[in-house]
Amino acid sequence: MEAAGNARTSTVGAQEHAWARVLWDFHTAPATDDGQGGPKGDIVLALGSHDVRVAHHAARLWRRGAAPLVVFSGDRGRRTGGGDGHRRWARSEAEVFAEASGLPPEAVLLEDRATNTGQNFSCARRLCQERGIGVRTAVATAKPYMARRALASAAVHWPGVTWAFNAFGGGYEGYTDDEHRPEELIAFLVGDLQRLAVYAERGWSAPVEVPPQVREAYAALVDAGFTAHLVSSAPTLPW
């Protein structure tokens, strides 16, 4: 999906962090916690990206018995495909994640065609059907702030399955590090909120109600210049 790549450099101060936390809390709200053993399913579906912490968490889910099989899904996306000045990954996200997970081969299924979130679900669904793997309940894992968008995508692209979402911990403050900068995280939070509205309008995901205070924080961050991850062909304020 196209994105607006020419956003101006933005400063992250206390106010920007406060707005971003509003978006973070909204995006991550559907995620299950790890109490009482955490969610369980027929598979764990790990959505590919540039963040290998997702692979590490998928391995943790498998080791604690969340599911007997982990499906790693993803070819290359914009970033892992070399977009925005990033180094192109030599292998698919699914392959990189599987290796990073350290899981035994019999616990892993690779889906290496998907290039977006909807395809993560539709391609994994097709692969499981081809392999005769019955899926009635499943656990999706991805970057924490993708909880709402992942579940909204699953509702359209893999209906008939009871989905839970679980991701690595740390919260808003613990997400960023030398490789994952605050300004980039905020741009992703902004872009994913826009996508909830835009993709539902296009029939790519289920509708999600966005409360007024979340829309207000989003608009403030757009005005502050955190627009690098917005869909360029869609309205900046889609509500």
Feature names for model-found ranges:
Residues 1-189, 239:
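A structural signal for short, hydrophobic/glycine-enriched beta-strand patches
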